[in-house]
C-alpha cells in the first residue's frame, strides 16, 4: 500500500466484481434481481462478479442506473484491476 497526498492506494488488484457483490449485498439485491433490472443474463452478472468478464461502458451505465454508483467509478475500478492484474 502506498500513500500520496493523504490518499491511500492499494498495490493489490481488487476485482470490481468483488465490489459489485459487496454493493448488491448491502442493498439486499440478489444477482438474479440485478440481472433482471439490468436486462442482462444472470451468467453475465456472475462472470463480472467472478472477474471473468470486464465491465464495459454500457454495463457501467446500467450499473449506475440500477445501483446509483456513477459509471466512471465502475470503469476506473475495471481499468485499475486490469492494469494491476497484467
Kindly label every feature range from the protein language model.
Residues 32, 43, 72:
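Key DNA-contact positions within bacterial/archaeal DNA-binding proteins
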Residues 27, 52, 77-81:
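The DNA-recognition helices of helix-turn-helix-type DNA-binding domains
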Residues 38-55, 59-64:
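Recognition helix of helix-turn-helix/homeodomain-like DNA-binding domains
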Residues 2-29:
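A short, Lys/Arg-rich alpha-helix, primarily the initiator
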Residues 26, 37, 66:
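Residues within the alpha-helical elements of helix-turn-helix
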Residues 21, 32, 61:
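Residues within the helices of the helix-turn-helix
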Residues 70-86:
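Short amphipathic recognition helices of helix-turn-helix/homeodomain-type DNA-binding modules
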Amino acid at each position: 500500500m502506498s500513500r500520496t497526498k493523504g490518499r491511500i492506494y492499494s498495490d493489490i488488484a481488487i476485482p470490481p466484481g468483488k465490489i459489485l457483490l459487496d454493493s448488491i449485498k448491502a442493498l439486499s439485491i440478489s444477482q438474479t434481481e440485478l440481472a433482471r433490472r439490468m436486462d442482462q443474463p444472470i451468467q453475465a452478472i456472475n462472470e463480472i462478479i467472478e472477474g471473468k468478464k470486464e465491465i464495459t461502458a454500457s454495463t457501467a451505465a446500467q450499473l449506475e442506473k440500477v445501483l446509483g454508483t456513477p459509471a466512471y467509478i465502475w470503469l476506473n475500478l475495471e481499468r485499475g484491476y486490469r492494469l494491476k492484474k497484467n
